[in-house]
Amino acid sequence: MKLKKTVVTTVVVAAMTVLAGCQSVPEARQQSVIEQLSSVSMLRQDNIAGAYEVAVAPGVDSVFVAAVPAFEPNSGGVVQRLDPRSLQVVQSIQLPRRSFALGFNPTSSTLYVGNTLDGSLTVIDATNGAVRGMIQLGERVVDGKGQVSAPHTRKVVVDPLRNQIFVTSPDSEGLVWIVDGATNKVRHTVETNGPWPAGAAFDRANNRLYVGQGGLNEVVVINPENGEIVNTLSTGDTTSADPKESKHFFVNMAIDEKNQRLFAADANTGSVYVFDLGNGKVVQIVPVGEGLLDIAYSEQRNEILATNRGVSRGSPAGTGSLTVIDGTNYSVNRRVDLPVHPNSVALSANGQTAYVTVKVPHGNDHPAWRKDAQDSIVRIDLQGG
């Protein structure tokens, strides 16, 4: 399968042909093309080098993608602003540090970029792409060779109501930083007492942060007001405190605030674990597939969306998909086949459209490898069946 500039419907191919020469196309015709693009069930653009997380920002009519085009020492990052209809890049925001994760505050129109390898957040004005500043979360250390290291960041979750930002740090003895969005200062640093805190989901009504990790207690519940762990949730499957014995690793999570359910993507088993937050028990386990990575919940559709790369030690080639799970009976409503390897998923404000980043394989021994291929962004109309 060729990954370069591949689009999945004939109407999109025609539309993109028009867009390629958009400078000479009358405005009315351009608008007609956008309407066509908005009506298709799936659209894919292979136009981002080093894509990672995606975030939807309806208030500024944009989709943002964090990207790391190069991994050389001292290389920077890029946040690409995309048109949510055509998925064309409309602005490239250059950053001094590599950008992996994204969190968006719709109230202040602020975009927070997780600089994973530098232990920091870059703060961006989402209205114009201006960099407002940087928040150093973990201490940066320079060794004798001049190499800089810092505790890594992972997930960035924003509470717009209280203007607070949560950032996980997935080390063997991991941390969670709670940042005051008004001052850009770290308010609390929380030790989770477990390995690799990675995924996170926030309950806005109850002001509770849920953090997924490995170990004996795969979920910790944090009160952001005082930075204290107020509860833990466990599958009960892990019986040893040795991280190597962890049966699960909840790499990403999503929450159903209305019905008080937590959805955890387990990278170890490739299944979604559903917790009832009322009693803290696992009520359902939904197999998705190898390389399970990201997860989102559409309250409007009562559906859980999960990406999986199809990659494991047993199958390094991998096949990708987005799995859509019924939130009532937990059956699989549909699987959307995607190129390798689906990465991050985000939903539109109305919960009817999914945006997924897809990474190309790096090794030339992979059957889908193509020289100079770029990563993709895919828009999927969930109403399209």
Per-region residue spans from a language model:
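Gram-negative bacterial Sec-dependent N-terminal signal peptides
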Residues: 1-23
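Predominantly soluble domains enriched in secretory-pathway, periplasmic, or organellar proteins
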Residues: 18-385
